[in-house]
């Protein structure tokens, strides 16, 4: 799979094209009989979506998601409230448009020539590919030539059906598939994971998220090239809603807020490591329970799961871990840092965790106030790894290379340059292993994603097991808990730091499975 791309250039080109087409409708606030006027008169923007980690999810009563945040900002832009309706599958989403029950569909839907004949697309803001997935250990198809309807099931309304039909007509005459009208893409992915289904097709971002909690889900092959993701609305003769969307996306693109939201949800790295993820989840089961009370005790300004992810990146939760440079313990503190924090034994789990948490808090306090609240933690982690002075150099280099020093997206791209002489020789604090700091932060984000999703699923499994045990007293919760749990939508935000986010940038595992 190609790396997911954020299409800022495409947005700019599309802006010019749509502006010409929509010019009679601008300024759209002055219209009296139009879609925007109807929305404002109603006082509500109606958006239909699908429950997924990337688009929209409710965790502990709070709402998250890339499309949700953008839709909320658009509602604010229009001066109205947002009403979100969650549907089971894509077909139901377009039914909402057809029946006049939704103004917009914001659900990670890809641009498709067949769709745009009947519905109005908005600006495109990132891209995905469609991929065939299977379970590790099962037969991996190398081509679609031998895939049939007894193996491959697709969710209703999935645009990939059009691609499959074209492939059947041009390359693979024996290709066949089944559409299950009662199941969405998430359910079908769960069935592949559980072994109930051989194959399904989903977008690369959704697959990347599933793999963080279920590393046994594997990519067999790409079915399509990269496809732009967009919102959809009804075809509108006066184009006022399209013009409003165009203005809105232009504004958030120019002020940097679109890039920040996409970094939050899509900026978590591009490599999936099956062995590493599986090892981490085993450690969550076998090692974390003993350390969890300490992480919860000392994580004051951040989510305890983030602190746990930092510790795993540092030491793999080994209190006796020691590096060649002399750093030691769960949080891998230097001797000088430990002394400055009043620690006497770096190999003592509680001392190490408390010291690491305080040191991270110190780094966060130093991050310039101009950095957005939800990105401060990433700057602090880079400073935690390579030193605050080198983080300042990275910001300075970002300015010199015409980037935004307050944008983590921009700054992290410059981190590897700190180890290259043409760059570090001109910086105040000189050489730094910036590439290691980059990998350090990205790995922590990945571990936190896995930890949050895995723990939330276990909690739900335990709750369901208790309910089933009450309904069927002959079966104990312990027996029910032995069954594999299904993937649920998972996001988490603690102390203002979002941990998910569907866009991660993922590629399928490199190791081929037989």
Swiss-Prot record:
It is found in: Cell outer membrane. It is an enzyme of class 4 (lyase). Gene3D superfamilies: 1.10.530.10, Periplasmic binding protein-like II (3.40.190.10). Residues 31-269 are annotated as: Non-LT domain. InterPro entries: Lysozyme-like_dom_sf, MltF, Solute-binding_3/MltF_N, Transglyc_AS, Transglycosylase_SLT_dom_1. In the N-terminal section; belongs to the bacterial solute-binding protein 3 family. Murein-degrading enzyme that degrades murein glycan strands and insoluble, high-molecular weight murein sacculi, with the concomitant formation of a 1,6-anhydromuramoyl product. Lytic transglycosylases (LTs) play an integral role in the metabolism of the peptidoglycan (PG) sacculus. Their lytic action creates space within the PG sacculus to allow for its expansion as well as for the insertion of various structures such as secretion systems and flagella. This is Membrane-bound lytic murein transglycosylase F.
